[in-house]
Regions:
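Short, conserved catalytic-motif segment at the N-terminal edge
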Residues: 53-57
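Active-site recognition of the HExxH zinc-binding catalytic motif
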Residues: 69-81
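Short pre-active-site segment immediately N-terminal to the catalytic Zn-binding motif
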Residues: 60-70
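Short, conserved beta-strand segments within well-ordered enzyme catalytic domains
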Residues: 46-48, 58-60, 116
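Secondary-structure transition/turn motif
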Residues: 39-40, 50-51, 62-64, 120-121
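Charge-rich, well-structured scaffold segments of protease-associated domains
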Residues: 2-16, 64, 78-273
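N- or domain-start disorder-to-order transition segments that initiate the globular core
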Residues: 7-52
Length: 273
């Protein structure tokens, strides 16, 4: 694969609308690193060509938060709740059960969000890439507001003990109920920030890096999460989840020509991307 990549990816040439900008050997990884840029979309790509049977793909986006609503953390969860091409409720869970993946995850950092996958089977890699790329570029969040409510936050009414099973829906029972916030990320961050060291870490970052993205809790502060609206959520996705703001990584013993053609034809040259 390294010899084939060297013949295909010559600096100064193009391949499937990718301009090959640089090539360097990385002895520590026993690999050759190729830096490419997709001409039409502006997407950047790093390909580490090596003999590792594990084939990996990742797409990341620059996502520096402007507040502590956790919008990028909620987006990370939400885009993996179905997409145009894969309209299932939990494609992430389905992939864990059905694919031959050796690694499958999504992570929100203080300034970026990354979606990595790995497998030893090349066809499985393209299946995983297809699901992840459609998830980030064509998620179901635009047609299903309930995804935002489920993964981000929503109101929930706790009825008095015994009232829930009565089924009369009486206004008296409703008035006696307690309104509270609920949501996957909301509850996750309540747990994370129940650790005093996490709270201290946030306070230190806010003091050291005021007026920067690092002053905010990228995962979301439960006190700030309910300030996020569905419209702000969609606008944030539209502004950040596009190829020009992305960095793609490919790694391992794979067919670079096929991989670049797949990325170009299926996603990067498509209007939706």
């Amino acid at each position: 694969p390294r010899a084939a990549a060297a013949a295909l990816l010559v600096p100064g040439t193009t391949c499937h609308d990718f301009a090959v900008e640089r090539c360097e050997t990385v002895p520590e990884l026993d690999s050759d690193a190729y830096v490419l840029r997709h001409i039409a979309s502006g997407a950047r790509l790093l390909y580490l060509a090596c003999d590792d049977e594990n084939k990996a793909f990742a797409i990341g986006f620059k996502t520096p938060p402007a507040d502590s609503t956790g919008v990028f953390h909620i987006l990370e969860h939400s885009v993996l709740c179905g997409s145009d091409k894969f309209p299932v409720k939990e494609p992430f869970v389905d992939l864990i059960k059905s694919s031959m993946q050796t690694f499958l995850n999504a992570m929100t950092y203080p300034d970026k969000t990354i979606y990595p996958v790995a497998t030893t089977n090349e066809q499985d890699l393209y299946n995983l890439m297809d699901v992840y790329l459609d998830a980030v570029f064509n998620p179901a969040i635009y047609t299903k507001p309930t995804i935002f409510e489920q993964e981000g936050w929503h109101y929930e009414l706790d009825l008095p003990e015994g009232a829930e099973g009565e089924g009369d829906g009486s206004s008296a029972s409703l008035r006696e109920g307690t309104l509270r916030y609920n949501g996957v990320v909301f509850n996750e961050m309540k747990g994370a920030l129940s650790d005093p060291m996490s709270v201290l870490d946030d306070a230190v970052n806010a003091a050291l890096y005021p007026d920067t993205a690092y002053a905010h809790e990228s995962g979301g502060d439960p006190r700030a999460i309910p300030a996020l609206t569905y419209e702000q959520f969609l606008d944030t996705h539209a502004r950040h989840y596009n190829p020009s703001n992305s960095y793609i990584t490919l790694y391992g013993d794979l067919d670079a020509d096929r991989a670049l053609a797949f990325l170009d034809e299926r996603y990067l040259s498509q209007p939706s991307a």
